[in-house]
Amino acid sequence: MLAIMVRFYQSQSEKSAHNTKKIYSDNHQLLISFINSKALQTMAKTIRPSYYDDDDISSEDDFTYSSKTNKKSRGDEEDDELSSISFGALNRAQAKLSKRDSDDDEEEEEEEESADDGFFEDSDSDGPPEESSSSNRHGNNDKKKKNKHAPSESSSKRPVSRIRDIPGLPSRREQTLHTDIRFDAAYGKADLRKIRKDYAFLDDYRKQEISNMEGILRDKKNRLNDDEREEIKLQLQSLKSRMDTLKNRDLEESILKNYKKQQMDDFKSGKVNKPYFLKRSDKRKVLQKAKFDSMKPKQREKAMERKRKKRLGKEFKQLEFRPNNR
């Protein structure tokens, strides 16, 4: 009875050892095939197709010979490697192989679907095939990217103003930035008499500025170049002409005011039945007579010379364009 039990246990142990060896051999074969496939993929990436030469044929023979020798040596070493590989490593290798096979199948299906779609889309149109989404994304980014030396762009939706700002010239905003609302036309016509009365003190500053400029021009110690001297002369002439204009305007106002006052006094005293208000032509004559009376002899001669030249110019124009009746 004891001998029968010993034989039974020996047979069971032999069966279990045979099963474990079979599992080891199957898993080892899977691992070997996985390693060989990876090696072939890397070699396929590095080896490129070309024309067949003698050197290529010899290299292919060497490659096949080396692969055969490797297979033989691996077959001899399989039994030794089975004992060193664990179940965990074999399970991980098997999971990776199954995952890789499923990924390859999905990629092949996607490639077939994209090829079918491209075929049907290209058959309808004569143009080039459409680019992928990634290429479209890159193309959009290239379009959005601008060169810093590119000309400036403006929106076509906004209407163009009639008066445009020219680079290098003062813009309209700068000109109208600091405007005095007291002289704005939107508030009505300005009262020159009141303005002149309120800002009469500015004449003192203008006179002081004229005297300073004349002193700068007379002083020989000031090392002024020709451009600076010419600019000061122009400013001095502008100030003098402005002062003369203001004086003439004040004189006209005083003459008309005095004439009006005299007429009202005569009317109140009974010398005249009705006051006489001057017409525009009469005003001009009265102002001209008063100006000549207030002028110095040299100024009067210059004014007479200007009037004579002006009158001669008008006469020459009339003679030049007179029609010939002969």
Curated annotation (Swiss-Prot):
Q: Which InterPro entries match?
A: RRP36
Query: What residue spans carry the region label Disordered?
Result: 51-178, 288-326
> Where in the cell?
Nucleus, Nucleolus
Q: Which GO terms describe its biological process?
A: maturation of SSU-rRNA from tricistronic rRNA transcript (SSU-rRNA, 5.8S rRNA, LSU-rRNA)
One GO CC annotation: small-subunit processome
Keyword list, A-Z: Coiled coil, Nucleus, Ribonucleoprotein, Ribosome biogenesis, rRNA processing
Q: Taking the first listed entry, what is the main subcellular location of this protein, grouped into a coarse class?
A: nucleus
Bias kind Acidic residues: ranges: 52-63, 103-129
Q: Which residues fall in a compositionally biased region of kind Basic and acidic residues?
A: 290-304
Provide the assembly information.
Answer: Associates with 90S and pre-40S pre-ribosomal particles.
Q: What does this protein do?
A: Component of the 90S pre-ribosome involved in the maturation of rRNAs. Required for early cleavages of the pre-RNAs in the 40S ribosomal subunit maturation pathway.
Which family does the UniProt entry place this protein in? Belongs to the RRP36 family.
Q: What is this protein called?
A: rRNA biogenesis protein RRP36
Q: Which organism is it from?
A: Candida tropicalis (strain ATCC MYA-3404 / T1) (Yeast)
